[in-house]
Swiss-Prot record:
Species assigned in the record: Hyphomonas neptunium (strain ATCC 15444)
The protein, known as: Cytochrome c-type biogenesis protein CcmE
Taxonomy of the source species: Bacteria, Pseudomonadati, Pseudomonadota, Alphaproteobacteria, Hyphomonadales
Chain's gene name: ccmE
Binding site for heme: H125, Y129
Subcellular location, principal: membrane
Keywords: Cell inner membrane, Cell membrane, Cytochrome c-type biogenesis, Heme, Iron, Membrane, Metal-binding, Signal-anchor, Transmembrane, Transmembrane helix
């Protein structure tokens, strides 16, 4: 084989390997590209299949937070800027910043009835967040 032909084969194989690696990376990461689904997006796309773990996010609707099982299980509604809502149930200790009207991202699965069962809650806050313990210090000086 001539040197030029060998170089072309080597270049072709290298290019094919790079394309294959890029395709594998794209397909592996495309599910993780969306940080969370809002109620509006889930209403448009439909609910994911039962048992598939997803993240849903939005705001905790004021007045929707209730407790059951002696306070062990909480239920609340996640809203966004659309008429769509998601009912979430969570059994565990909520983050300190979790409250009605605040942003939340919940990780979990949908039940056959369409309720979202969260295994993890993340409370979102704005960039101006300051712990309660430091607020008196700021006021004093």
């Amino acid at each position: 084989m001539r040197a030029r032909t060998r170089r072309l084969y080597t270049f072709g194989i290298a290019a094919a390997l790079i394309v294959a690696a890029a395709a594998l990376a794209f397909f592996a990461l495309r599910e993780n590209a969306n940080l969370f689904y809002t109620p509006e997006v889930l209403a448009e796309k439909g609910l994911p299949r039962e048992g598939r773990e997803v993240k849903v996010g939005g705001w905790v609707e004021p007045g929707s937070l209730t407790y059951a099982d002696g306070g062990a299980t909480m239920r609340f509604t996640v809203i966004d800027n659309s008429p769509s809502t998601i009912t979430v149930s969570f059994n565990g200790v909520a983050p300190d910043l979790f409250r009605e009207g605040q942003g939340v991202v919940a990780t979990g699965t949908f039940t056959p009835e369409g309720e979202f069962t969260a295994r993890q809650l993340l409370a979102k806050h704005d960039e101006n967040y300051q712990p309660r313990e430091l607020k008196p210090l700021e006021a004093g000086g």
